[in-house]
Design a protein with these regions (language model features):
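Short beta-strand/loop element within the Bergerat-fold HATPase_c
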Residues: 95-107
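Acidic ATP/Mg2+-coordinating residue in the GHKL
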Residues: 115
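Short conserved segment of the HATPase_c
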Residues: 120-134
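Short conserved segments within the C-terminal catalytic ATPase subdomain
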Residues: 53-62, 68
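Short alpha-helical segment of the dimerization/phosphotransfer core of two-component systems
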Residues: 6-15
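Short helix-loop "hinge" at the ATP-lid/N-box region of the Bergerat-fold HATPase_c
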Residues: 88-89
């Protein structure tokens, strides 16, 4: 009976997460995008929050972030970075690492999240941004989530005039690159 209750609770949590994410995706266009966002402190805050998850999985977190700013929705950019770093932890190998770098390239901020996980097959590198797509369906239960995280990441990046791509992936890990327009200096 305890196992059944636990299973029902797990499914309810998963359904709640699905509904929450679907609502979030449907409301993206209406979110105000006028916040002044300091990206390096935002990355620091996310890494601090995710440190217990990383430690639980024996994953080291590293960062090298320039002080860059942009205008947009602070909550949405937080969610974008959070999803990518959390995925880097969840889909990594024990003893692995997640590295976040932020640098200016021309008039954009380029955020790279690199992990040391098993990589993403070449034929899946575009599909992973589609809602409900999973590279390894057999691991979806143990990983949790509903398969909307990367779709949400792409929507948020595009909504802010940016993009997200799989820049590199091999059996030694994956690098996601997010480009976002920098704030104009007055």
């Amino acid at each position: 009976t305890a196992g059944l209750v636990s299973s029902v609770r797990e499914q309810l949590d998963r359904l709640t997460a699905l509904v929450r994410t679907l609502l979030e995706m449907s409301n993206l266009q209406s979110v105000s995008r006028t916040d002044q966002i300091a990206l390096a402190p935002l990355v620091e805050e996310i890494l601090t929050y995710l440190t217990p998850l990383a430690q639980k999985n024996n994953i080291s977190l590293q960062q090298d972030c320039e002080e860059l700013g942009m205008v947009g929705s602070d909550a949405l950019i937080y969610r974008l970075v959070f999803n990518l770093v959390e995925n880097g932890i969840k889909y990594n190998r024990p003893g692995g690492a997640v590295r976040v770098t932020l640098q200016q390239e021309k008039q954009t901020a380029v955020l790279r999240i690199t992990d040391t996980g098993p990589g993403i097959p070449a034929d899946c590198r575009e599909s992973i941004f589609q809602p409900f797509f999973r590279v390894d369906k057999s691991r979806s239960r143990e990983m949790g989530g509903v398969g909307l995280g990367l779709a949400l990441v792409r929507e948020i990046a595009v909504l802010h005039g940016g993009s997200v791509t799989v820049e590199r992936s091999s059996e030694n890990g994956t690098t996601f690159a997010v480009t976002l327009p920098l704030a104009q200096r007055c």
